[in-house]
Amino acid sequence: MHIERLDFENSPYLGVFGVATDRVVLVREGLQEKKLEVIREVLKVPVIEASIMKSRIIGTLATGNSNAILVPWYVWDTEIERIKSAFKEYGIETEIVPFRTKYTALGNLILTNDKAALVSAKFSRDEAKEIGDILGVEVERGLIAGLHAVGSAGVVTNKGGLVHPEASDEELEWLSELFKVDVYVGTANMGVPYVGTCMLANSNGVVVGHLTTGPEIVKIEEALGLI
């Protein structure tokens, strides 16, 4: 089982509420245990419930890879300590790093795997370099399909990538070279182009919004290297 449809309290926008890497999944608090178990079974990593300033939209606010997870600088110390404690319990060697910038929706503005990161051109060059240093990867500033919200417009793992359907062939080639995986265009949740908001994915599998169609699932599996 490497792909499953799921909803979070009837919302198909799973990526808004979580961050998935090859080491761990951070997900909003309050989900039913049976849904947490689906995520564990499909993504095959520990699933840790978390909040940021009591907000549930942690996929919008945070992002990361196996090396580090970036969170807004204003996250409460108690929330950071709770995540770090859970990481220690599971033996997860991933840093949690509050990142000081005027932009708080880090999950919307950063797209990353364990090989590279694409950050919105809204970030300064110095900020981009710092993000790359924290994540331990090569970093570039740019857009996808003319959009600054590169983290919402795409999803990328260490095996593949899927981005907004209006991305050009030139962008796909550039993204493939950057992330060192094949990158395709596609949608989820019955035509939603902001695929990063619709799913949680890592190299082991993907959970997608429950509105995702059969043809979309086939494309997602292909793009993320799961078939």
UniProtKB/Swiss-Prot annotation:
Xref: HAMAP family: eIF_6
Keyword Protein biosynthesis appears in the UniProt entry: yes
Molecular function in Gene Ontology: ribosome binding; translation initiation factor activity
Name of the protein: Translation initiation factor 6
Gene3D superfamilies: L-arginine/glycine Amidinotransferase, Chain A
Source domain of life: Archaea
Protein keywords: Initiation factor, Protein biosynthesis
One of the protein's GO biological processes: cytosolic ribosome assembly
Keyword Protein biosynthesis: yes
Role summary: Binds to the 50S ribosomal subunit and prevents its association with the 30S ribosomal subunit to form the 70S initiation complex.
Species, as recorded: Pyrococcus abyssi (strain GE5 / Orsay)
PANTHER family (alphabetical): TRANSLATION INITIATION FACTOR 6
Family: Belongs to the eIF-6 family.
First and last residue of the signal peptide: none
InterPro entries in alphabetical order: eIF6
